Amino acid sequence: MSTDVTPIAAPGAGAAERWRTPLELTLLGAIWGGSFLFMRIAAPDFGPLPLVEARLALGALVLTPFLWRARAQFTSVLWLRIAGIAAINSVIPFALFAWGAERAPAGIGAITNAMTVMFTYLVAFFFFGERITARRLIGLAGGFVGVAILASGRTTGDGVWQAALAGTAASVCYGFGINLVRRYLTGYPSAAVAAANLIAGAVLLAPLAAYTWPARPIPAPSWTSAVLLGALCTGAAFVLYYRLIARIGAPRASTVTYLIPLFGVVWAWLVIGEPLTMSMALAGALILSGVALSQQRAPGK
């Protein structure tokens, strides 16, 4: 990973962004699509809070060198601000999704996570005064329909509604957290901000995680999943996500959550052999079209 980190700055437009943003959103969706599979594997052995602690700590370990380079910028006031945002944007939603992963298939968490887009736009509109254009509303609606098609046929089984409610609550947290990152952490190196967020979250959760840590040994497959969940799906992904928030804004960056269920289905097909259907193909087309439309700027902007 390069140590040349671009500071968070105001969003900018240019010809390169036409390709850069969709590619980065797709990469991030692919990474986060795998996170629910890893949680499904690891959560039964770790338990929700210990798994989240491992995820936060491992992600922080990957990013700490970036924070060390920028440590002079991180005052005590900034650390308090980051701790509050970390609770809303990491600790609580991670714990809710991990709790749900113990009770339902991985796809349920990935599908409910797609509601982050809706909540992010609503928070931005009602609390931060950001406009929602008709073009983006159409794109959001198309993506939402695609997610609904993916969800069809996946809503039965023990614990599904519990997992769905937990995922919805987590998405509300993300909606606020994403906007708070954009509002209060602009101007700092993105990788350093991501590292500080994960460190603060790990410190906040440590007492509860230690108290609930499993007494029995955790098997190797669960540890492998936890390492990938922390280092790749949290550490590396947070850097990319914070850079997107800085460049294109919180609501547009949050549309990546429409891609997560799509990639969750693809990874399930590749890794555990779940079948692909025509409805999934239709859903994928709607999701991709919706995300693309929501990213387009109005003429003259």
Task: Give residue ranges: language-model regions.
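Hydrophobic/aromatic residues within transmembrane alpha-helices
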Residues: 42, 51, 55, 100, ...
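Cytoplasmic-side transmembrane-helix entry/capping segments in multi-pass membrane proteins
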Residues: 25, 77-87, 132-143, 163-164, ...
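Specific transmembrane alpha-helical segments of multi-pass solute transporters/efflux pumps
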Residues: 31-39, 64-113, 149, 230-248
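Hydrophobic transmembrane alpha-helices of multi-pass small-molecule transport proteins
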Residues: 57, 63, 83, 123, ...
